[in-house]
Each structure stands twice: as structure tokens, then as C-alpha cells.
Amino acid sequence: MEMLQGLLLLWLLLNVGGVWTSRGPLRPLCRPINATLAAENEACPVCVTFTTTICAGYCPSMMRVLPAALPPVPQPVCTYRELRFASVRLPGCPPGVDPVVSFPVALSCRCGPCRLSSSDCGGPRAQPLACDRPPLPGLPFL
């Protein structure tokens, strides 16, 4: 009986040491979605909005029940698996200013660690990213 209790306790510690925040897909899972973004350059007179594909959605995560007793569990984020780069040209830029802005286009996505070198790892923003200059919508990609 003591051995059975010991095995049960071990099983509980291993399996209940963390709790899944969701048992099923309550939100859309990590995938490419269309998003409208803005690009501007301080030296150019207008801001350009364009539509691209970004990675967004839910990644299953785990939270420790006993946070002091166990090390923290890395939280995965929805990030690029495959991507390509596209560009837009900002009109009206003065000579000597590069008018081309490049941006990533998500081809496929995955849940994984956030890499600051290629992703914005911040949480939700109080206000969406917006232009400081007057917008000029819908320019074609280069």
C-alpha cells in the first residue's frame, strides 16, 4: 500500500506540477493571418499602409502550480516558421533618403520561443501601431 501511495504521489508531482491553461482550442491556433500594417520614414512626407501576412493565434502554454518549488516554464509564442520579405516604396522622399521599406511575409507559423531578433515579444498594446504622418493607403509591393 505504501508503494502505491508513493507512486501516486510521484505521478501527481510529475503531472500536476503544471496545469495546462487550456485543454482544447478555445481560440484560433497559431497560423498566418492577413494584417494591415503601416510604414513611414521621418524624412518622407507620408505614411503607407499595406496588407501582409503575419503569425497570430493561440499557443498552448503551461503554468506551474508550485512556482517556488519548480523552475519557470518557458511560454511559447506564435512566430514565423517560414517567411519571405517584401518591400514597399514610400513616395515623395527627398533625394538621398532610401524610400524602400522591407517587411516579413509569413508563409507558415509555429509555436516556439520568442526570438527578439525576429519578433516583437511584447504583449498586447494599448493602441495599435499607427502613423505619425498622413496615411497613403494601398501601395503595391515592389
From Swiss-Prot:
GO terms for cellular component: cytoplasm; extracellular space. The keyword Acetylation does not apply. It is found in: Secreted. It comes from the Eukaryota. One of its GO terms (molecular function) is hormone activity. GO terms for biological process: G protein-coupled receptor signaling pathway. Residues 1-21 form the signal peptide. Keywords: Disulfide bond, Glycoprotein, Hormone, Secreted, Signal. Disulfide bonds join C30-C78, C44-C93, C47-C131, C55-C109, C59-C111, C114-C121. Its main location: secreted. Glycans are attached at N34. SUPFAM superfamilies: Cystine-knot cytokines (SSF57501). It holds the Pfam family Cys_knot. The keyword Mitochondrion does not apply. InterPro entries: Cystine-knot_cytokine, Glyco_hormone_CN, Gonadotropin_bsu, Gonadotropin_bsu_CS. Belongs to the glycoprotein hormones subunit beta family. Heterodimer of a common alpha chain and a unique beta chain which confers biological specificity to thyrotropin, lutropin, follitropin and gonadotropin. Promotes spermatogenesis and ovulation by stimulating the testes and ovaries to synthesize steroids. This is Lutropin subunit beta. It comes from Panthera tigris altaica (Siberian tiger).
